[in-house]
């Protein structure tokens, strides 16, 4: 009986280790940057022409908060601490900030583009608002897409909100910058919701 319990305990430990390894695998680079680009017919010339940086997937993530939809929002430890401080300061000024999107794997980035292609969108149009896999700040675990309760969707009109006005004035104190202002050199549309902690 004792031997059976010992074997069962070992099996439980092995299952826990396997689950942890699978989780870590999600948060570490498993694909070369060229593979997903080729699969999506994204030309290397497009990347070069726009001067897009490569971003590797971060290895260490922590749970920041749970979204209203039940999704886990994860960032690097430093970005998570900065986000909590930013969010608390905003709240003290009557501004509620919500994370809509955060860490995203290379594979997930490719899936987003694939879904848009399947819906009939052209790749050049997609790449005005979605970074190619391997070139998204979301891979770093330092980028957040931010909304507010009165403006929960990610669109350009977020720039007209009190939340955006507050972020524009205060986010820099917490290490966050607006990644894609109007006329940005990377060629993305204006994204008032996309802010990145300078890790």
Report residues per predicted region:
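Extracytoplasmic cell-surface/polysaccharide-interacting catalytic and binding patches
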Residues: 1-102, 106-199
């Amino acid at each position: 009986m004792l031997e059976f319990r010992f074997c069962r305990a070992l099996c439980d430990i092995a299952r826990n280790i396997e689950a942890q390894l699978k989780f870590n695998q999600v948060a570490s680079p498993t694909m070369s940057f060229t593979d997903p680009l080729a699969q999506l017919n994204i030309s290397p010339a497009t990347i070069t022409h726009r001067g897009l940086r490569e971003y590797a997937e971060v290895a260490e993530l922590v749970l920041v908060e749970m979204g209203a939809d039940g999704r886990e929002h994860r960032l690097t430890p430093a970005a998570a601490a900065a986000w909590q401080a930013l969010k608390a300061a905003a709240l003290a000024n009557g501004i509620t900030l919500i994370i809509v999107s955060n860490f995203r794997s290379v594979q997930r980035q490719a899936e987003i583009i694939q879904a848009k292609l399947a819906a009939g969108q052209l790749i050049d149009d997609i790449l005005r608002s979605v970074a190619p896999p391997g070139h998204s700040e979301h891979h770093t675990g330092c980028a957040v897409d931010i909304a507010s309760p009165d403006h929960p969707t990610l669109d350009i009109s977020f720039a007209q909100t009190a939340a955006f006005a507050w972020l524009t004035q205060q986010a820099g104190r917490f290490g966050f910058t607006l990644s894609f202002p109007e006329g940005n050199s990377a060629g993305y549309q204006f994204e008032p919701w996309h802010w990145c902690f300078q890790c």
